[in-house]
Structures are given as structure tokens and as C-alpha cells.
Amino acid sequence: MSSTPDYFDRYENFALKRSESGVLTLRFHTNGGPVTFTGTTHSDLPRLLEEIAFDRDNKVLVITGTGDRFMTEIDGASLGDLTKPMGSDITYLEGRRIPQRLADLEMPIISAVNGPVSVHSEYALIADIVIASETAEFSDFPHLTMGISPGDGLHIVWEEALGINRARYYALTQGTFTAAEAKEWGAVAEVLPPDQVLARAQELAENLAAKPQLLTRYAAITLRQRISRRMAEGTALGMALESLTAANLAYLPQAR
């Protein structure tokens, strides 16, 4: 195993730690506490995923949050003026690359959902194995609340994880489903007490890291072919429609 790479300390919202066997744990945070998703997070994540992918010392990725939640807060203003084409263009670029790079990451991904996730729950549910806390709840707060359509990959991941009709129901009603419900539907593999979630995810990751690396890499590619293809087909239109609905906000009565 090589020394700690420079990119481990490059990004302010991601704490990275790698075991000797090659299990990389990515923890979302803001100043050491639960993360507030910002324009910086959105900009940095596709870059980080690219660096993770090209670092061949990374054998398995574990994704988790900080404290008692996975991700529930977002600073919409920090994403820029999405009502203008050039303002939304960078969000379009980043928004397509994040889910595609997760889908194409050549290693197993395990999510340790340590609590509620109402912002970018697709980051948790796209994982090959989802381990959730008994306190975890899933929903999509930002899109309809902010007046934009959900086209950044959430629509694809939810359809794959929940089923098409159920995904549409929860996206349009902004309803919340529990970890237990998600397990019943097949979206979550295991539901555990909060203090056991990360340890269990890392245990599974260590088991995978002990296998031949080409095996786990190519297994990940094989098992994610469908969702990778759907991301390539669906996020271009999805993000374009997000941009159109964002632009429309400037013309709504409350904006005048």
C-alpha cells in the first residue's frame, strides 16, 4: 500500500480513510459534523470520484455520513443562479458526472446509511450493498421544494431500487420511507442499530477486499451494466429538464 495520497486532504466535505487492505471509507461532513450539501460539494464530488477510480490501491469503497444523519441539509443558493443558462451549465456538467462515475466506479461500493437522507439519497441507494441504520429514512426534499424536476440520477436510482411506480409516487409526493420499508422492497440489504452500521459495512468491505482485485473490479462492472447504461441515457435529458425548470423560476409570480 502506498503512502496517503494528496487527494485525501484536498476536498473540504469528504473525509477519507483507507485500511491496509484497500477499503476506502468516504465520509460526508461539514466542519466535522453532518454535511450541508453546497455548490462546493457538487463541484468536488465528481473530481474526487475520478481520483478514487484511478487510485488502484482502492479496492472497495464505503460511503457514509457523519453523526446521526447521512445527508439532510442543502444550501441551494451556493449552487449559483440556476435561472440563467450559464449558471446552470456547470451544474448540468457536474450533475451528469456524479451518478455516472458512481455507476462506473470499478470497485464494489457499500453504503453505510447512518441516519436520515433527504438530499441526494441516490448516492446511498446506488451502492452494490446498502446497510442502513434503524433510524434511517429516505426522501427527496430539494427538487420539488426548490421548484425543479428530479433529473440528476435520483429518478433512475429510485426506479431501480424501489420499482417504477413506487419511485414515482415518492418523488411526486415527497413522501418518506423507512429503512425497514426499504429492506422489504429490496432497496436495503440489512437494517441494524445505529452503532453497528459502519462496522458492518466495513466488515463486508474487508471480506471483498480479500478477494482478487480483478475479480471484484470486474464483478462491479458486470453487476452495474444496466444502471450505468441508464445513467448514460437518462441524465442528459434529466439534467436538461432540471435546468429548464430552474430557468422557469425567474418567471413565476413569486419571482417578480
What are these regions (language model features)?
Residues F14, F37-L61:
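A short, well-ordered alpha-helical element
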Residues D128-I129, Y169, T173-G175, E181, ...:
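Well-ordered beta-strand positions
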